[in-house]
């Protein structure tokens, strides 16, 4: 009987450990990942971004405390695992480590879909939710949102102006849609009406949150550009889908794909 008890204890110990461990997220991108991967009872607190529907995806923080990334605010949470971008807050991370806090770095490391999937899988193991994340990864890998357009050169504009596609979410978004960046890259420095017309984009993607103003984005209202895109594919998605390189990019691609079906 005693032996049976010991075996059962050993079997359920890992489950108890996962259930009792809690996590604190201190940045927008870790908020989004934690909300998707962890169970609600595993989340102890999140950043203020977690309550903003313009920045989060479909899972908002409605009942968890929000914390600023400050040492004094985190002192009551030193027994939790802290998800933080070390490059944003190097001094805070150093101070927390001196106090023995458990840090799980969520930096802007992934640059490809496979690297992102590896991070998601790691967080799934960390939280004991491997089955869920494997299902999520399989869903993302199987998503087919290619637009099958013959002309694919794409201009992406956001509320903050021209999108420079060196951050991984934009090349990934284009790849998911079967689109390509402009052959003549436009940057914030060389962006102008003349340069846009010369680049002859075949597709326009607008990314906005309807809260910002930018002179470059305002160029879209120019009659010449209005005429250029009058009979060309023109899509719009909220900015929340590209704030972070995470599963939101796939959601954004799916939203554009659905728009293409009714154009």
What function would you assign to each model-found segment?
Residues 84-86, 105-112, 155-165, 238:
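Short beta-strand->loop
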Residues 70-79, 98-99, 192-200:
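Short helices/loops that flank or line small-molecule/ion binding pockets
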Residues 22-87:
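A short, structured surface patch at a secondary-structure boundary
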Residues 49-52, 60-61, 163-189:
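Alpha-helical, coiled-coil/dimerization segments enriched in small aliphatic residues
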Residues 2-10:
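Sec-dependent signal peptide recognition
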Residues 21-37, 129-178:
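Basic- and aromatic-lined ligand-binding clefts that recognize polyanionic substrates
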Residues 10-19:
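Hydrophobic h-region of N-terminal signal peptides that target proteins for export
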Residues 26, 114-125, 134, 147, ...:
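Structured C-terminal subdomain patch of bacterial secreted/periplasmic proteins
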